[in-house]
Amino acid sequence: MAYPFQLGLQDATSPIMEELTNFHDHTLMIVFLISSLVLYIISLMLTTKLTHTSTMDAQEVETIWTILPAAILVLIALPSLRILYMMDEINNPALTVKTMGHQWYWSYEYTDYEDLCFDSYMTPTNELKPGELRLLEVDNRIVLPMELPIRMLISSEDVLHSWAVPSLGLKTDAIPGRLNQATVTSNRPGLFYGQCSEICGSNHSFMPIVLEMVPLKYFENWSASMI
């Protein structure tokens, strides 16, 4: 869950988000080291009186500044590719949910159940209850079982949208005429908030997403009550 004046990422709720957080820290460390080295070299150049205006080539230096950046790029690319494969892979999903973006609300369909589908609109500010979040609450939350792989099929009825839940490491474009796939897995129960992350019109800011992750038993009771 985000909080005011937050500088870092939201707490990871899924294995994918944990990997993304580690990759962020890994890349940031490399960027920090490179920036420190460059600033150190610049400070030396500005403070020293020694110059080498007659130097035309330096084979050793050129070799170093060719091989070193290549090695750094490999160190960044390898964990990135690993995470990409993890995000794309889903074997035997326990549940499939189809998500459709509209101007300006979301609709959900549980394809493993008959007639289990609903629309999800933002709750107006004047209807919020104490403790609820402005511009983030919805009238119908999407309820999913925790600790199980869930396949989300995401598309759009009209314009480009993007279904995004930061704490789960999810951001998948909803494109008209195209079906995109995302994997949802939560390590713990709770409410997780997201929003449409693609500018889709005048009410783009009013398309929140609320996932309620619950134990499997509670999900079965909820789905039975909805059918």
From Swiss-Prot:
Intervals, Mitochondrial matrix compartment: 46-59
Binding site for Cu cation A2: 196, 198, 200, 204
Any Pfam family hit: COX2
CDD domains listed in its UniProt record: CcO_II_C
Signal peptide feature range: none
InterPro entries: CcO_II (IPR045187), CcO_II-like_C (IPR002429), CcO_II_C (IPR034210), Copper_CuA (IPR001505), Cupredoxin (IPR008972), Cyt_c_oxidase_su2 (IPR014222), Cyt_c_oxidase_su2_TM_dom (IPR011759), Cyt_c_oxidase_su2_TM_sf (IPR036257)
Catalytic activity as recorded in UniProt: 4 Fe(II)-[cytochrome c] + O2 + 8 H(+)(in) = 4 Fe(III)-[cytochrome c] + 2 H2O + 4 H(+)(out)
Residues the record lists as Phosphotyrosine modifications: 218
Subunit relationships: Component of the cytochrome c oxidase (complex IV, CIV), a multisubunit enzyme composed of 14 subunits. The complex is composed of a catalytic core of 3 subunits MT-CO1, MT-CO2 and MT-CO3, encoded in the mitochondrial DNA, and 11 supernumerary subunits COX4I, COX5A, COX5B, COX6A, COX6B, COX6C, COX7A, COX7B, COX7C, COX8 and NDUFA4, which are encoded in the nuclear genome.
NCBIfam families reported in the protein's UniProt record: CoxB
Protein name according to UniProt: Cytochrome c oxidase subunit 2
Species the sequence originates in: Rhabdomys pumilio
